[in-house]
Amino acid sequence: MIRAPRLFQSMISAIGDLYLYKLSRVLFGDSSAIWALFAQLTNWFMFFCINRTLSNSLETVLTLVSLYYWPCLRPSPSAVPSGYRYCALLAAAVACAIRPTSAITWIYIGILELFTTRNKLKFVCLEVVPIGALVLGLTFLLDYLLYGSWVVVPLNFMKFNFFSSGGDYYGTHPWHWYMTQGFTVMLFTFIPFSIAGIVESKEWKLAGLIAWVLGVYSLLGHKEFRFVLPVLPIALMFSGYSLSELGQCELAKKKVNGGVGYRVKHSRKLKMALLFLLVTNAPMAIYMSMVHQRGAEDVMNYLSEAVRDKENTINHILFLTPCHATPYYSTLHQNIPMCFLDCTPSEERVTMDESDQFLANPLDFATRFAQNWTRPSHIVLFDSQENLLKEFLHSHNFSEIKRFFHAHFKVDRELQASIVVYGFRDC
């Protein structure tokens, strides 16, 4: 149950790899397609993120599938089979149903297609509207079955994130963050190759898509790496084109049986580029995927095994951590009461949620919280708060049971070097 969702996501990711290869082959040829796939598989952020069960990962795969079928991106749009555009629209509509912000991508592509296609009225009225209505109707029905009432989730999503800037509740970045930090970190050492690929290929439509998506997302206050994940493979595809150009074989003269023959000489520049990309990306991929912030996984694996133990004493777990800090029930898979600090956004911007209150003053919050709690058998917290709560924990008869490494450096808050499990002891 723990591995199944991740294995399923890895299969979905493989579909994305396939369509990146197919799209690159259509646009740039076989050699570029191979190197585009190399870039996709060796880029540290794709390695780190694409197999995670995030809606952004699925959105990225659907984006690659849809881009492959759009006629406006092909060298000869009129030669594309008529059914391809239906496939493109369907994949785009599903991507928007999963993440409404995916519409940012498809507004750009839709305008390109509108200018490219001959029968604009047919495109809009007989293709876009019916397919969009079908997918939207199915999402309405699914939401009704799950919520028990008619809810327009995409509208609520757009209202919260765009019209009311609700995402700012979780933190903001300067307008240039994607350009100077976010997307540049994601591309990492592939940046010069992507830029070279854009200039050499002159594929301005796809390059424009990257600029459009980054530009629109830059207008929003709340920014995250994963938001622009769908355009990362496109940038890597340009890296593949650049590597292909570097790898053009040279013919070198060589004496053969007394005469003069030729042998293939592979570009030294390509070999140096590949070594550079592997040396810089492989350590990052391994460290970020297997070391950095691993404590959240390790602590839940430990609790999951402890619950199954015959001498199990776990009957209620309290997470005194920032909300959503661990995989929670998706790893535990046992009917054990658990609770974590609430971080539901409030319409009152000045109101602090439980998570913020705890981080602002851990001891004061824990003291007030303990007045009305159902005493847990175990408490999970980070060492940064543990240092302030040791006396509180000991006074309530909790002692340390297990400690797990979490991170070497801080990310968006103070360093959380380890995550600790405390257990209640009967006196």
Language-model features: locations:
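Membrane-embedded, lumen/periplasm-facing catalytic core of multi-pass transferases
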Residues: 251-378, 405, 416
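Membrane-interfacial loop-to-transmembrane alpha-helix junctions, especially the N-terminal start
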Residues: 201-209, 270
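Specific aromatic-rich, kink-prone transmembrane helix
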Residues: 39, 58-77, 87, 234-238
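Transmembrane-helix motifs of polytopic, lipid-linked glycan transferases
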Residues: 7-28
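Short helix- or helix-capping micro-motifs
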Residues: 36-44, 92, 96
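Membrane-lumen/periplasm interface segments of specific transmembrane helices
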Residues: 95-171, 176, 181-194, 206-207, ...
